[in-house]
Design a protein with these regions (language model features):
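A conserved hydrophobic position in a structured secondary element of the catalytic/binding core
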Residues: 143
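Cell wall/extracellular polymer interaction/catalysis modules
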Residues: 1-137, 148-166
């Protein structure tokens, strides 16, 4: 089953509808590093990362790992580890995954720009927890924590996220 995400900030999954936040630049067909856009297309979910010091481990069929204080995600297009999880400190630019603001308490990693990784094509496209008021993201798709927990708990390997550009 597809989780259909559209430009109006609504995700539909079967009969369910969830509010979500998208990238500050909307949905684009050609994603570029730093453009603040959510990439259009079909995405698979590969694994779940979570802050077990803050939330109860979600029940999921996806591979699950506990986040650690030194976890990061490389966003430096010329680095060998571009668009990959890394340990901090790291020699290239990275986003810290262990955050104070709670948006990464539950992260679902997508398969965007992974096989192969293309420099400058975008990194760290996740499903994660929305900020208050569903403020725009840097390109990810963000949901209320309870909605994201539900999605993770009912996700099956054949399911996909379909991000539709108008």
């Amino acid at each position: 089953m597809d989780l259909l995400v559209t430009t109006n900030g609504i995700a539909e999954w079967g009969v369910r509808r969830f509010r979500c936040a998208l990238g500050r630049s909307g949905i684009v067909v050609e994603k570029r590093e730093g453009d603040g856009a959510t990439p259009a297309g079909t995405l698979s979910l590969s694994r779940v990362l979570c802050r077990l010091d803050r939330i109860v481990q979600p029940d999921t069929e996806l591979v699950l790992a506990a986040l650690q204080p030194d976890d990061g995600w490389c966003d430096a297009p010329e680095a060998a580890n571009y668009n990959q999880q890394v340990r901090l400190p790291h020699g290239a630019s990275c986003e810290a995954l262990w955050r104070v603001d709670r948006v990464y308490d539950l992260i679902v990693v997508t398969d965007f720009n992974v096989a192969p990784v293309v420099p400058h094509a975008g990194s760290a496209i996740f499903l994660h927890v929305a900020r208050p008021g569903y403020a725009p993201t840097e390109g990810c798709i963000a949901f209320a924590l309870d909605d994201l927990r539900l999605i993770v708990s009912e996700w099956r390997q054949a399911d996909r996220v379909r991000v539709a550009a108008d």
